[in-house]
């Protein structure tokens, strides 16, 4: 099965590395095109485009300027260890074993506005370029038009290489829109995580994001190969609710903490 997760805005280029192994991103020629476009933007334009503070706009203008495609362990970091948002809090990649990284390299992909598709050990330089940003480019008005079918084609290659047609969709809607589902040669399964609040179960963003990371780790650590095995997921109090689930959607609930 192929697990899809979102990237994160928060990055970590300081912590000790859990592995020294690395690979190179496979779509860097596309990244270079986007960097070329982004470099033409002033810091105030970046701030407006991304709805971020002046300080963050300055940081990202500098990142775009400093970015260059010769990635080494000295100027870049493995994607799975560089991202540090809520999903990655659940994933805790810094405690994975070398065997876990091997499995993840075959079965986990991160979608990215700048890099398209990243494998866990792919090096990346720091950036901020969310998939939903309306960055005009030669292919259209936003990143969805820029990436077109490229991301889907890369996922199809990954599916073929890892041996089955199961796709576990743990990405946000913003990133999943970059996947052309009609062209995807896989069967989609979407885990949904509901937390109890005041007696009602609903999606609570922070918990749901972390749960996507927990589920990713559960699949990696247990080397899962069948969708049926996902139903045993019970990290941090979640349990499978068969009645609330339907074809293609597995619902997990957790009682109020």
From Swiss-Prot:
The lineage of its organism: Bacteria, Pseudomonadati, Pseudomonadota, Gammaproteobacteria, Enterobacterales. It comes from the Bacteria. Belongs to the UPF0246 family. It holds the Pfam family H2O2_YaaD. GO terms for biological process: response to hydroperoxide. This is UPF0246 protein KPK_4750. InterPro entries: YaaA. One of its GO terms (cellular component) is cytosol.
């Amino acid at each position: 099965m192929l697990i899809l997760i979102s990237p994160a805005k928060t990055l970590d280029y300081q912590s000790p590395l859990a592995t020294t192994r690395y690979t190179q991103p496979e779509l860097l020629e596309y990244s270079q095109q986007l960097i070329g476009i982004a470099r033409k933007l002033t810091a105030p334009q970046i701030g407006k485009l991304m709805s971020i503070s002046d300080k963050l706009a300055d940081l990202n203008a500098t990142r775009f300027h400093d970015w260059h495609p010769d990635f080494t362990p000295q100027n870049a970091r493995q994607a799975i260890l560089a991202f540090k948002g809520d999903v990655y809090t659940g994933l805790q990649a810094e405690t994975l074993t070398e065997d876990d990284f091997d499995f993840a390299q075959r079965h986990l992909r991160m979608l990215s506005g700048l890099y398209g598709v990243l494998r866990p050990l792919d090096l990346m330089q720091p950036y901020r370029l969310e998939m939903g940003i309306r960055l005009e480019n030669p292919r259209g008005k936003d990143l969805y038009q820029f990436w077109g079918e490229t991301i889907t084609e890369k996922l199809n290659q990954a599916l073929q290489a890892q041996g089955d047609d199961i796709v576990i969709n743990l990405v946000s809607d913003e990133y999943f829109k970059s996947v052309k589902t009609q062209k995807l040669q896989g069967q989609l399964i979407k885990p949904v995580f509901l937390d109890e609040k005041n007696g009602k179960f609903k999606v609570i963003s922070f918990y749901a994001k972390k749960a996507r990371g927990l589920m990713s780790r559960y699949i990696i650590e247990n080397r899962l190969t069948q969708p049926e095995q996902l139903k045993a997921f019970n990290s941090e109090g979640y349990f499978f609710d068969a009645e609330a689930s339907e074809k293609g959607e597995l619902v997990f609930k957790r009682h109020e903490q």
